[in-house]
Amino acid sequence: MEHYRGSFDNPAMYTPLVSASLSLIAGLHGGADRRQQTHHVRHAIYRSAAAAGIAGTGFHFYNVMKRPGGCSWNNLFHAAPLGAPIALLLSGALGAVAERLRDEPAHEPQLLGMPAGRALGLLVAVGLIGTVGEAALLHFRGSFQHRAMYAPVSVPPVAAALLAHAALAVPRERWFTRLWLRITTALGFAGAAFHARGIARRQGGWHNWSQNLFAGPPLPAPPSFSALALAGLAALRLRETEK
């Protein structure tokens, strides 16, 4: 939607559409694949998505910096969103991790030379912090006009801290971390409902969807918290079984 609003001015703007679509297909295929080994095509798709996310972040940063004023609040608010390509990077990274785990033994799997639960937990914690930064920027632009707008900048940071602690500390049962990650998952769905309500309250509401989907709060943004929190729950489960 953002690139459509930008009229696909640069041919590179088609890249995330292709990459995200392929990642979605790869994810559906991987979910149905019962073979316990890495699928090299899926793995390549996920790695390409991560690379596209890195390149997209560079393009968006350039878009911000080339405007008058450079790295100013006005440009951060209204130029290409810096946090958007990172979502593609995270989805690619998590997909690649899932593929790598297929080659690991069921008992004590390893990632990047460390226990899989620790590695995945740290990755998700970093992803949560980055997503919080993007939400904080957008809600600051909206002047936090509704009290609920403070939720995505207060709940997920706690989840990230708890998950990072679980990843780095001695493995054990962590019921409070699990509970907080579930709250963060619910927060993402609740945020999508709030954003849908925000679109409905604009002039013309959903009858004027072709304009309000672009001008209103972004519908796909809040579920990113749900996706990361679910990945965090998987990491926590892995971590609790490690020695």
Regions found by a protein language model. Give the residues of each.
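Short amphipathic, positively biased membrane-proximal segments
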Residues: 1-243
